Amino acid sequence: MSDSIYRVTEVIGTSPDSWEDAARNAVETAARTLRDLRVGEVVKLDVTIEDGHVTHYRARVNISFKYESGD
């Protein structure tokens, strides 16, 4: 078995409905440009507020993917 190296990037997803949808949006959007995603870790949840009401849920997600060298 060969050694593997993984890279981690942080993305923030948003949703007007829930934190779960916000996290899903973050992962699905990242998957459009990153290959071989492995693990998503929700590291922070917050909301945006306007006029005293929650308008969007936000999920900050660290996503790991397999690093491919240019060699």
Where are these regions (language model features)?
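Basic/polar N-terminal segments that are highly enriched at the extreme N-terminus
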Residues: 1-2, 71
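C-terminal structural segments of small proteins and small subunits
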Residues: 52-71
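Short, conserved loop-to-beta-strand elements that form functional interface hotspots
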Residues: 40-49
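Short, well-ordered alpha-helical segments
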Residues: 4-38
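Broad gene-expression machinery/nucleic-acid interaction feature
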Residues: 6-8, 44, 56-62
